[in-house]
Regions:
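GHKL (Bergerat-fold) ATPase N-terminal catalytic module, capturing the glycine-rich phosphate-binding loop
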Residues: 1-155
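Glycine/threonine-rich ATP-lid/beta-loop region of ATP-binding domains
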Residues: 108, 138-186
Length: 186
């Protein structure tokens, strides 16, 4: 099976039944009433992040996919809907708008061991700590962080007290589910 510009998700599913279920992006959230913190993690089974890739691309915001030469042939063969969307660190900036630290656990095919990176926001000095780990991980990455769910954030997320609903542009079904979960927490 060869990917090309005209490959659709349906073509992929026919060639590889259950691929989307087996390689789904997993999002996990938890809330502690005792601490008032929300714990959030996103796990994928993508290409992972090597230590070199981390140093060259994640520590330098604004470096886009076209500059990542090692992936260019692979990306060009991908249909547009499958190409990477991240590029400029906007996701990282968003995370650091609610928390001071982010932990990334990742395994790349180009390395024998997994990596663990902890990034701290500019408010905490902007440090990044990286280490190889003996932890057994499948190829892919997990990004995890926690944040205190303040009254202001509760209002921002749920739209209570006449506030602007943060989730208003999200698909209605997803919006209702997220709002239901947040209202349960709050």
């Amino acid at each position: 099976f060869q990917f090309n510009e005209k490959t659709s998700p349906f073509d992929v599913e026919r060639a590889y039944p259950n691929i989307f279920e087996e390689h789904a992006i997993m999002i996990h959230t938890d809330y502690s009433r005792e601490t008032g913190k929300v714990y959030f993690s996103i796990r994928d089974k993508g290409i992972g992040i090597s230590m070199d890739e981390f140093k060259r691309n994640i520590l330098t915001t604004g470096r886009s996919w076209p500059e990542r030469k090692e992936y260019q042939d692979e990306i060009k063969r991908m249909p547009e809907w499958l190409r990477p969307t991240g590029a400029f660190g906007i996701g990282l900036h968003t995370v650091f708008s609610v928390t001071d630290s982010l932990t990334i656990r990742t395994k790349s095919d180009s390395e024998n061991k997994a990596n663990e990176m902890t990034l701290y926001s500019g408010k905490k000095g902007g440090y990044a700590f990286c280490k190889k780990t003996n932890q057994t991980l499948q190829r892919g990455s997990e990004f995890s962080f926690s944040f205190l769910l303040t009254e202001e954030l509760k209002e921002w997320v749920t739209g209570s007290n006449g506030g602007k609903l943060f989730l208003e542009n999200v698909n209605d079904g997803i919006q209702k589910e997220i709002k239901k979960i947040m209202e349960t927490w709050c």
